[in-house]
Amino acid sequence: MHDARQVLQKLWGYTDFRPQQRPIVEAVASGRDVLAVLPTGGGKSVAFQVPALLRSGTTLVVTPLVALMEDQVARLRSLRVAAACLHGEQSAAVRSESLAGIETGRWALLYLSPETLLSPPVWARLQGCPIARMVLDEAHCLTGWGSSFRPDYHRLGAARRALGHPPLCAFTATATPADRARIERWLGLVDPVRLVIAPYRPNLAIRVRWMYTTHQRRDAIGAFLASRPDTSGLVYLRTRAGTEKLACELAKAGYRTTHYHAGLGAAARRRAEGDWLAGRLQFLVATNAFGMGVDAPHVRWVIHAHTPPGLEEYLQEIGRAGRDGEAATALLLASEPTGWLDPTDRLLHRHFAANRLEQWQTAEKALARLPAQGDFRPELALSLALLHERDRLVWETPFRYRLVAAPPIRPPEAGPLVQDFVRTRRCRWQFLMAAFGEGASPPCGRCDRCTGRTFK
């Protein structure tokens, strides 16, 4: 740890690591596999960046978003660390420089997405590169996105083996015990060092309100915003069209806002994010495409205009408020329990469930005609990921699979946890802590169940 502290002080200016960082740094530096569940702002990046500078070889950092990797690389280069990233939005000259640096072993840290890692030009160059370790940042994307629209996540365990089985560190801010087990199994972690910090945020007051009409939902958002005229926040919706419509309505009402979703071009997304971070926009109206890795301490509130699909996503998103330790609020607007007066949440759930069922039906059809062994086929990427999720397929290499005998696959049923959370009479934080494996915890004293107040 002495060498690690020297690097920390020389480059980052800190005399010692935070208590939660020390076991991670020790494990990474000693070549152990690691699974770390740390709240955002817990210093996870430094925990793997410092060890990457203590030994030769390249540390591959697999991260989901271009903005994340570019931000990290810019910070490292300002410290004169040999770091680079690879993604499809780069100019030809920048990409060429990054690729050349792989072959010469120039990079101490190389940031890239799963898709870029497994692309032919990058994969070919990595074969001759000494890989010191791999890092999977935002590891919850493996369980949350890997079998929906980022199927290459499911090939990362095989990629690791093909690269000589370097130590692997997986970091995330939220993961249930079941998801932690899946991450370990799918990545092939061997006797990992596990560090799990409870996601409890004592300064974050959680509120849930029943909505009985679509008009009431709009009014509730307007009233909440009017009560916080000079504060920064985020409004989350489930659909792209919904974000555009609501942002337009609120902008016409005089609010400094715009929409954000994955369907926007890269320039538009970065402009919206930059304007919000700089304070030119009071808030963004966004889908779940926004927020991962964004460290904005000034966020005072988060609104969910609809019930989110899962508690992992919900906890990730409300955790973007109050990172400075000051009081913050998370407001969830849920359709009334019957779904008859306000069917919004029920209709959204049916829409996404139908899409999911269609994906499973496609996977079942693919299974019936796949050979027992075969090569990766891009047109079947999602079906292959679903089969891997259900233990019907193993990746022998990142580009070759083998089917395994197992009972017929069935779509996993969505757990009732989100609706249980909305309807619970317990302290909201007590419910969340239990759902994430934290056991008994005292009431928070701040949520709507503890205070009897919904809106303040």
Give, region by region, the residue ranges found by the protein language model:
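Conserved helicase motor
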Residues: 86-95, 114-119, 198, 237-241, ...
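Conserved nucleic-acid-binding Ia/Ib motif block in the N-terminal RecA-like helicase ATPase lobe
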Residues: 60-61, 66-112, 194-195, 256-260
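Conserved helix/coil segment N-terminal to the catalytic DExD/H
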Residues: 42, 91-133, 143-147
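Walker A/P-loop
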Residues: 31-50
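C-terminal helicase lobe
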Residues: 232-236, 240-244, 248, 252-262, ...
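Conserved interdomain hinge at the start of the Helicase C-terminal
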Residues: 207-238, 244-249
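Post-DEXD/H (motif II) to motif III coupling segment of the RecA-like Helicase ATP-binding lobe
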Residues: 128, 132-133, 140-196
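Conserved pre-motif I regulatory segment
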Residues: 1-37
